[in-house]
Structures are given as structure tokens and as C-alpha cells.
Amino acid sequence: MDADKIVFKVNNQVVSLKPEIIVDQYEYKYPAIKDLKKPSITLGKAPDLNKAYKSVLSGLNAAKLDPDDVCSYLAAAMQFFEGTCPEDWTSYGILIARKGDKITPDSLVEIKRTDVEGNWALTGGMELTRDPTVPEHASLVGLLLSLYRLSKISGQNTGNYKTNIADRIEQIFETAPFIKIVEHHTLMTTHKMCANWSTIPNFRFLAGTYDMFFSRIEHLYSAIRVGTVVTAYEDCSGLVSFTGFIKQINLTAREAILYFFHKNFEEEIRRMFEPGQETAVPHSYFIHFRSLGLSGKSPYSSNAVGHVFNLIHFVGCYMGQVRSLNATVIAGCAPHEMSVLGGYLGEEFFGKGTFERRFFRDEKELQEYETAELTKTDVALADDGTVNSDDEDYFSGETRSPEAVYSRIMMNGGRLKRSHIRRYVSVSSNHQARPNSFAEFLNKTYSSDS
């Protein structure tokens, strides 16, 4: 018997077939550099920086920026941001720099140039006759890179969220060591004219390069990162959520995964922890692999590990975390089942801790405590393990164990308890729910059952 087939009758004729559905047509690609060459892009001819500054600033004021010119200028302006490498810097077998080397952002990557001249038009008129200073270049670079961050902000953020961020960014780039070069609200006005610039590969690449540099190198102009920080772990929300989750519940990755009681986690856990990646290497190219073009479709995104992502945020909702309540549900990854498991895990980790004495007045007190603890352990091992209580919460002698939680779920037939539903409704009903968020899902799914 073929386990994948179903049998039924059509007009008295027996039909046997294998139902096939649309599968994920994308191939997840792991970031890797196999040829020992730094990530690279190709831009037009390197400009005269004074001419380029005046042209790009003019375009910023007129809200008419040329993306090719902006990228060419950003690459050329890297020379203003020299710093000292604090340690030998290697990633994927490539020596980026040695300890003590003087480096700039373009030391991290390879920027190839053609002979094609840029436009360098003065769309906003000629406002600056003298040559710009380094603080003026730094301010322009900071404002341009901030267009990346603004274009990554989702439309679901309500009110004046984006405008407020744009105003705060402008304030950063008009105070020392930077200098005011644009009028108030210029950044937001210009952003509206280039709202999708985060999808331009070269602009994204340069934002990631600047971010990787300033995240490691102490520099006067490190605040430029305010516009590029979103390139760090970009499209890695699944892996980032898991990392935050294990810190939140105070378990190791191995201990946490033991609580993942569902077959759909198997493929995702294998995908997320593929051997050979530099996930744990500080300042690796891995951190910026999406912006540097090292992977087409991230295997670490919320969609790639949707069941894990859903579970983590249902647990977060149970614990009242605003970030989880606002996160977007991955609708195709069993959210109803994940909400059930999330309720049990939320109960297990919420309002409950594992505590022990770790500090003592002197060595004698420490030794007495350790001796007493050993005696307790011996007594526990000698116990025949008989449980006299019918209360499922005392089903296991160990307060935090996968076995105890799994037993509770099985005893309840894989359904949520009333107390879980009340908690879910309580946290979600007091929250202004965004469309397709976990708060909205919990409200719609469980509010009638409370």
C-alpha cells in the first residue's frame, strides 16, 4: 500500500491517486565564500568628491536622487572614514585586515569601477561654491544611508512612526561631530521619492559594508550606523527570534529544542543549524550576508522557519511581550497548533524560575551548603517516585522538564486549558492589534472561548 495515495470512487469507478500541492519553489541558499574573494560590486567611474558632494546634496534638497550617482559617491567617500583594526579580522577564510592595520569600509569588500561617467547633475541648483569639509561629507553619507533604514520600515507601523525616526536621524546629523547640511524634514520628503531603495542591490551592499565597518571599528563618525543597523542579521528574523527566545527563558539552544513537540520542527531545526556557517563568529560576513549578496533566499528568515517563529512568538505573547504581540503570524505554518504548544510552554516558563544559592559568607558556609545539597539528592534518588497528587502540575518532580510538559499536553488531549485561553485573551485584548499580528490572531481565535 502506498502511504501517499488515496482511493475513492468516481461514477462507480475506483480511482487511486497521490494528491500533490504547490511546494515552496524557492531554494534556500546558505551564505558562503568558496573562492576566498571578498564580496564585490561594480560601479561607474570614481567621481571627483567635491563635485559629487555638491551634486548629491543638490539632489537630496530637490528630492531627485540618482541611485547610481549616490552609490558611486558613497563608495568614493569611504576614504574619509579610516580607522584602526583592533584584532586580526578573518571571515570565511579571508584575511580582511591585521591587528593595527589602517582600514576604511572599502577594505572589507572589493569595489570595481568602469569608465562610465556619472550624471552629477545639480537638480536642486548650486548652493555650495566652496569645497565641502569632512564633517559635511560625513553628514551627507549618514543622511543617504538613512534612506535604507527608512525604506525598510513596514507600512504597518502606525501614526507618525517613520516621520519621527526621520526627524531624530536629522538631529543626529546636525550635531557635532556632524554638521547641519539640510533643512528640517528634507530626509522624509526625499525618502518618499525613493521609498524602495532597500531593494537596489548596490545601495544595499554599500549600507551593509558601512555597517560592518562601524560595528567593529571605533570611529568619530560611528553614529552613521543609525541608518545601516538594519542590515545586520537582515532576513534572519527566525534565527534572531530563536536566540532571543532562549535568553528569555534562560535555557541553552539544546535544552529549548527538547520542548519542540511537533514533527514540522524537524526540517526547520535542521535548516537553521546547518553546520559550517559562521553564525557564532563575531564580525563575520555572515552577519551582513543578505546585503553583501552572499545568499539569494535566506534559510534563517521567519518564512523559512515559520513553525519555530510562530511558536516562539506565541510563548512571547503568553509572557506579555509587546514585540511578540506585534510580530506577523506566518499563516501557512500551523498557527493554531503552535498556539496550543505556546500556551503550555508559556505556562512552563512564565512566573516560574530555577533558583539556587550561589553566594556565601565564607568557605565553611559554602561547604555546608554543598554537603546538604548532596544529601538532598541522595534522598531523592532513594525515593520510589510514587506520586500521591492527582494535580498534573506536580506530575514531575522536576519543575522544568520537557517530559512534564509533554505529559500535561497528552493528559489534556492536545488542547489548551481554560487558564491558557484566559491568559492569551488577557494579553491580546489589552493590546492595539496590528493587521495579521499575533495579538490579532489570539483575539480572533480565542476571545469567544474566554
UniProtKB/Swiss-Prot annotation:
GO terms for cellular component: helical viral capsid; host cell cytoplasm; ribonucleoprotein complex; viral nucleocapsid. Keywords: Capsid protein, Helical capsid protein, Host cytoplasm, Phosphoprotein, Ribonucleoprotein, RNA-binding, Superantigen, Viral nucleoprotein, Virion. Changing residue 407 to A: In strain: Isolate Germany. Pfam families: Rhabdo_ncap. Coiled coil: none annotated. It is found in: Virion; Host cytoplasm. InterPro entries: Rhabdo_ncapsid, Rhabdovirus_ncapsid_C, Rhabdovirus_ncapsid_N, Rhabdovirus_nucleoprotein-like. The modification Phosphoserine is found at residue 389. Phosphorylated by host CK2. Unphosphorylated protein N seems to have a better affinity for leader viral promoter encapsidation. Phosphorylation of protein N in ribonucleocapsid may stabilize the interaction with protein P, thereby playing an important role in viral transcription/replication. Displays a superantigen activity in human and mouse, activating mostly V-beta-8 subtypes of T-cell receptor. Belongs to the lyssavirus nucleocapsid protein family. Homomultimerizes to form the nucleocapsid. Binds to viral genomic RNA. In nucleocapsid, binds protein P and thereby positions the polymerase on the template. Protein P acts as a chaperone on free protein N to prevent it from aggregation before encapsidating genomic RNA. This is Nucleoprotein. It comes from Rabies virus (strain India) (RABV). The gene is N.
